[in-house]
């Protein structure tokens, strides 16, 4: 079966983290699928699609029609990809989903080799591993997060210079108080002491050393 022959068909997917998504299959690229769920266009990296199916008509419990008020941000004449989509979303209010707890709202500032820099009005400057991005939703109707005005959303929210790789960027934060993975594990916050053999040494609030596997770091933000 050629999956691209089914563009425009209702589909159900399971994403990493036991998340279920259903909607209309809009496009498929080299490393990205686009689904319209009746409200938003979701851009889902292929690597996080655990399984999918085209349900039978009697299994579909919703009717989804494409909206004239919204359109995807990709060029229909080009093959879509995650990097192209992130680039197109720069400066657009965007929702991203990384951890199992909640979505993050804000703006993509910069796209590096294996991570991107994201500004959230709540968490401020964040570093997001591309390997752990489950999906993103760029909003194309001039929405602003939390009803904030442009004056409350700094164009250059950080004076930090960004390293090309996620690993080197974390190394630059040695001696800094940080929170990993949005605090989903209360132990994953403290002061970075160093990085060695793909493990981050963290000093916890009680002064104890804790070693975190770099490959399992999804997000980083400073306190």
What are these regions, as identified by a protein language model?
Residues 1-105, 109-189, 193-223:
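Short glycine-rich, low-complexity segments
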């Amino acid at each position: 079966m050629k999956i691209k022959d089914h563009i425009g068909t209702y589909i159900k997917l399971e994403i990493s983290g036991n998340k279920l998504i259903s909607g209309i299959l809009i496009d498929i690229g080299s490393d990205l699928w686009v689904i319209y769920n009746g409200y938003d266009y979701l851009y889902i990296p292929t690597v996080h699609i655990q399984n999918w199916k085209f349900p039978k008509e009697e299994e579909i419990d919703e009717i989804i029609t494409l909206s004239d008020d919204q359109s995807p941000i990709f060029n229909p004449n080009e093959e879509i990809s995650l990097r192209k989509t992130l680039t197109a979303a720069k400066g657009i209010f965007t929702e991203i989903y990384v951890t199992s707890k909640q979505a993050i709202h804000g703006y993509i500032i910069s796209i590096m080799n294996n991570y991107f820099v994201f500004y959230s009005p709540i968490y401020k400057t964040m570093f997001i591993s591309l390997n752990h991005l489950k999906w993103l939703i760029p909003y194309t109707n001039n929405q602003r997060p939390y009803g904030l005005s442009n004056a409350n959303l700094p164009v250059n929210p950080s004076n930090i210079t960004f390293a090309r790789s996620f690993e080197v960027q974390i190394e630059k934060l040695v001696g800094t108080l940080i929170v990993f993975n949005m605090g989903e594990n209360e132990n994953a916050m403290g002061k970075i002491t160093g990085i060695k053999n793909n493990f981050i040494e963290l000093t916890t609030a009680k002064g104890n050393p804790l070693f975190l596997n770099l490959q399992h770091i999804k997000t980083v933000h400073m306190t």
